[in-house]
């Protein structure tokens, strides 16, 4: 008897889905699910999504900060520092988040949809947006 989607039920011949592998199950005639079973795959997907969202957020913030300081001498360095900080933060938070949610799903013996790392990366970048406001950052 097959149990609900557990780690013990990894399909024979399972191949890790390609990177985004996001599927939309509603009104899809070719309903093709994509699940992650191994912690290394969960880590990779989490890291990629976090780097994508952090890159977009910090490049945009760096361009805006550089444009507001364009008449001063160090405006290019502002952009470089934003991008560097976004990359380092994306690498660390993506790694921690990937291994953490991978361990949680593994301990529950569940497989993970490819949407979960995307949603975790969105939550992480929204947390950065909330902390970017000075009043909220000083309260926390």
Swiss-Prot record:
Annotated protein name in UniProt: Uncharacterized protein YPR153W
Gene Ontology terms: biological process: cellular response to hydrostatic pressure
GO cellular component: endoplasmic reticulum membrane
Domain of life: Eukaryota
Source lineage: Eukaryota, Fungi, Dikarya, Ascomycota, Saccharomycotina
UniProt subcellular location: Membrane
InterPro entries per record: Transmembrane_pr_170 (IPR019334)
Transmembrane segments: 45-65, 76-96, 116-136
Residues linked to a glycan: 27
Family per record: Belongs to the TMEM170 family.
Alphabetized UniProt keyword annotations: Glycoprotein, Membrane, Transmembrane, Transmembrane helix
Membrane topology: Multi-pass membrane protein
Keyword Transmembrane helix on entry: yes
Entry keyword Metal-binding: no
Pfam families, A to Z: Tmemb_170
């Amino acid at each position: 008897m097959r149990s609900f989607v557990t780690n013990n039920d990894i399909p024979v011949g399972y191949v890790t889905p390609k990177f985004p592998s996001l599927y939309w199950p509603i009104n899809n005639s070719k309903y093709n699910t994509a699940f992650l079973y191994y912690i290394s795959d969960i880590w990779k997907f989490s890291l990629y999504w976090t780097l994508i969202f952090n890159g977009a957020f910090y490049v945009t913030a760096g361009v805006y900060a550089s444009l507001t300081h364009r008449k001063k001498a160090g405006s290019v360095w502002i952009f470089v520092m934003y991008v560097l900080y976004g990359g380092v933060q994306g690498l660390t938070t993506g790694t921690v988040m990937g291994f953490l949610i991978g361990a949680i799903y593994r301990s529950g013996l569940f497989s993970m949809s490819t949407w979960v790392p995307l949603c975790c990366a969105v939550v992480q970048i929204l947390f950065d947006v909330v902390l970017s406001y000075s009043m909220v950052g000083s309260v926390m």
